[in-house]
């Protein structure tokens, strides 16, 4: 009398594994673990375990904990009525140089947390705000202090240019 072993299928990997990860291209198989292999027929959970091992993480180009996105409705609350200097990046989703400025603004938001507020505004979604501040080219970064525009920087420039303007704005507000 032969004992038959029934293997319980392995539970699927938790959904948290799939956040920010990329799976390998379909159609590629590893010997012994394909759908038609005898191992897959005998132990159905085997394939799932193998797929979980194939998951690779994707490194993020920049940290998502940077500048927050604002809207035209929240403009007065976050920019005009702010008691500390505010940096606003005007950008558009189709603009390549804007992505480079995103990284700089995100770094500045983390480095100057508490001393300056950093926000992003999509000019395609809110053109009325862009036209009211004469934004004709993007990326454009504006610095506000006490509700008034103090600096305007247009184009993709080194981080030192933005930091210099911020330091000047912060030193003016402390005096």
Curated annotation (Swiss-Prot):
**A cellular component annotation (GO) from this entry:** cytoplasm
Annotated site (Contributes to redox potential value): 96-97
List the transmembrane segments.
none
| Range annotated as the organelle transit peptide | 1-59
In this protein, the active site sits at: 95, 98
Q: Where in the cell is it found?
A: Plastid, Chloroplast
SUPFAM superfamilies (alphabetical) = Thioredoxin-like (SSF52833)
Please list the residue ranges annotated as the Thioredoxin domain.
61-171
| InterPro entries, per the entry | Thioredoxin, Thioredoxin-like_sf, Thioredoxin_CS, Thioredoxin_domain
Instruction: Name the Pfam families on file.
Output: Thioredoxin (PF00085)
Q: Reply yes or no: does the keyword Plastid apply.
A: yes
Is-annotated flag, keyword Transport? yes
Query: What are the protein's UniProt keywords?
Result: Chloroplast, Disulfide bond, Electron transport, Plastid, Redox-active center, Transit peptide, Transport
Cysteine pairs bridged by disulfides in the record: 95-98
What GO annotations for molecular function exist for this entry?
Answer: protein-disulfide reductase activity
Q: Which NCBIfam families match?
A: thioredoxin (TIGR01068)
Q: What does this protein do?
A: Probable thiol-disulfide oxidoreductase that may be involved in the redox regulation of chloroplastic enzymes.
The Swiss-Prot or TrEMBL record describes its family as follows: Belongs to the thioredoxin family. Plant M-type subfamily.
What is this protein identified as?
Thioredoxin M3, chloroplastic
């Amino acid at each position: 009398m032969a004992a038959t072993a029934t293997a319980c299928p392995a539970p699927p990997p938790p959904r948290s594994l799939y956040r920010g990860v990329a799976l390998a291209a379909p159609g590629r198989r590893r010997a012994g673990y394909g759908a038609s292999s005898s191992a897959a027929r005998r132990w159905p959970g085997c394939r799932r375990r193998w797929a979980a091992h194939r998951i690779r993480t994707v490194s993020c180009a920049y940290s998502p904990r940077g500048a927050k996105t604002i809207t035209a409705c929240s403009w007065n609350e976050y920019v005009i009525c702010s008691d500390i200097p505010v940096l606003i990046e005007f950008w558009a989703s189709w603009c390549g140089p804007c992505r480079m400025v995103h990284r700089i603004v995100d770094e500045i938001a983390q480095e100057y947390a508490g001393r300056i507020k950093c926000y992003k505004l999509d000019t395609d979604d809110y053109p009325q705000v862009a036209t009211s501040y004469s934004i004709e080219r993007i990326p454009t970064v504006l610095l506000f202090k006490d509700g008034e525009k103090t600096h305007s920087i247009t184009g993709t420039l080194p981080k030192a240019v933005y930091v210099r303007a911020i330091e000047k704005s912060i030193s003016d507000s402390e005096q």
